[in-house]
Amino acid sequence: MTPRLSFHKYQGLGNDFILVDNRWQSQPCLSPEEAVALCNRRFGVGADGVIFLLPGQEGADFSMRLFNSDGSEAEMCGNGIRCLARFLQDLGIPGRDGAYQIHTLAGRIVPQVRADGLVTVDMGIPRLLAKQIPTTLVEPDEKVIRQPLAVAGREWRVTAVSMGNPHCVVFLEEEGSLEELDLAAVGPLFEHHPAFPERTNTEFVQVLSPTRLRLRVWERGAGATLACGTGACAVLVAAVLEERAESQATVELPGGNLEIRWDPSTQHVWMTGPALHVFSGTTAG
C-alpha cells in the first residue's frame, strides 16, 4: 500500500501521469513498487507513470524522475516533461519567460510554456550511434538505418534513435497496415529483443506526406500508449535519415498531434504539444 500522498494527475495527448511535488528531498518519496500500485487503473489512481519533481542539480532549476507503470525507470519522457512544465506553472513558479531548466537522467531538457498554453521543448540532439542507443544490430560506432531485424517470424527494417531513451522505428510500407498491426502481440517482442540490451520503445509509422507522419507506439515499461513525445521525435529523425520526410512535420498519434522540428543548423529536436491538468487528490494511505 502506498503512503498517504498528495498528487496531481496530468495528461499529454492521453499519455497520463501522476505528478508528485518532491522538492523537499533529492530522492523519490515512493519506491518503484509503490509507483506500480499507484499506476494501477483498477486499484490505484491509474497512469502510465509517476513523475517526481525534485530539487535541481548540476545548475538546473529542478530535476525530474519517472517510474513507469511496471516500476522501471525511464531516462526521459517527452509528454511527461511537458506535463511537468505545466505543473510548475500551476504551482505558481513562472520560470524564465515560461522556460525551465530540468535535469533528467538523459541530460538537461528545457520545456517552455507558451502564451497559447502549448508547451515547446528543446529535446536536445538525437544520438544515432549503436553504442548510444544501445543496440547490437551493427558495430558500436555505426548508425542503425534500415537494418534487418527478425521479429515474430518476419524480417523488419528498423532505424534506431536515442532521445535519451532508446527507440526502434519501423516504417510500414503497405497502406492500412498500421491499423491492422497487432501491437499487443508484436510490441513486447521488439521491446525485449536481445538486440536491445536495455529494452526499447518501438514506433510503427505510416508516412502520409513529407510533412505528416502517423504512428502507433509500444513504450518500454508502459506498453501501448496514446502518445509518446520522445517517440514522435525519434520518428521524425528516422524519417529524415531514411529520406522519407522533411525536417519539420506533424506527427499524428492516437491521442492527438505533436509538431516536431529537427533544426538542421543546431541538430536540436524541438517538440510542441499540449499538457493538461486533470485532477488533484490525496491517497488514503
Swiss-Prot record:
Pfam families to which the protein is assigned, alphabetical: DAP_epimerase
Active-site residue list: C77, C228
Alphabetical list of PROSITE patterns matching this protein: DAP_EPIMERASE
Reactions the enzyme catalyzes: (2S,6S)-2,6-diaminopimelate = meso-2,6-diaminopimelate
Sites marked Could be important to modulate the pK values of the two catalytic cysteine residues: H167, E219
Positions annotated to bind substrate: N15, N68, G78, N79, N165, N201, E219, R220, G229, T230
Pathway: Amino-acid biosynthesis; L-lysine biosynthesis via DAP pathway; DL-2,6-diaminopimelate from LL-2,6-diaminopimelate: step 1/1
Top-level taxon of the source organism: Bacteria
Its job: Catalyzes the stereoinversion of LL-2,6-diaminopimelate (L,L-DAP) to meso-diaminopimelate (meso-DAP), a precursor of L-lysine and an essential component of the bacterial peptidoglycan.
Record's subunit section: Homodimer.
Protein name from the UniProt record: Diaminopimelate epimerase
Organism, as annotated: Synechococcus sp. (strain JA-2-3B'a(2-13)) (Cyanobacteria bacterium Yellowstone B-Prime)
